[in-house]
């Protein structure tokens, strides 16, 4: 059994760990700003995606508030986003849908410059603000199609 002093020490250690593991408010705000900007670009009226009423939403640890700092100083924070289209042409394959989203990202000067090599399932934007390791994150954008009419 632990005594009151030991419990307080453990609580303090856990608080410090929580503060050091969680992303900072600045990091969170930068990620939110980026996610919203990408969403605005992918859903704007001029977009090739517009006719499919895309919905852009964060996923994974970011949406549930458990995003953590990277352990390796060369790594960055991971932000997962889904670009959900409501419908598609009947002849489209998964590759066609992914290419449509990639084309829209490449049509934006900033996103084209930070677009990583094509991934297997998603597009990745690599943000490197001022070269500061604490301001590095990447956004994985996963194209999807809502075929059931149900969405989160």
Predicted regions and their residues:
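N-terminal regions immediately upstream of nucleotidyltransferase
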Residues: 1-76, 87-96, 122
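Conserved catalytic core of two-metal-ion nucleotidyltransferases
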Residues: 42-45, 64, 98-152
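Glycine- and aspartate-rich repeat motifs characteristic of hemolysin/RTX-like Ca2+-binding segments
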Residues: 80
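Short hydrophobic/aromatic beta-strand micro-patches
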Residues: 84
């Amino acid at each position: 059994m632990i005594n009151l002093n030991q419990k307080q020490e453990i609580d303090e250690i856990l608080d410090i760990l929580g503060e050091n593991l969680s992303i900072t408010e600045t990091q969170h705000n930068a990620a939110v700003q980026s996610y919203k900007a990408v969403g605005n670009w992918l859903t704007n009226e001029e977009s090739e995606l517009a006719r499919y009423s895309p919905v852009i939403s964060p996923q994974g640890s970011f949406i549930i508030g458990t995003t953590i700092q990277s352990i390796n100083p060369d790594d960055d924070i991971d932000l997962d986003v889904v670009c959900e289209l409501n419908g598609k042409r009947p002849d489209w394959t998964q590759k066609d849908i992914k290419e449509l989203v990639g084309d829209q990202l490449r049509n934006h000067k900033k996103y084209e410059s930070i677009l990583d090599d094509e991934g297997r399932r998603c597009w990745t934007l690599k943000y490197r603000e001022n070269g500061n390791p604490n301001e590095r994150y990447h956004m994985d954008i996963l194209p999807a199609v809502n075929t059931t009419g149900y969405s989160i």
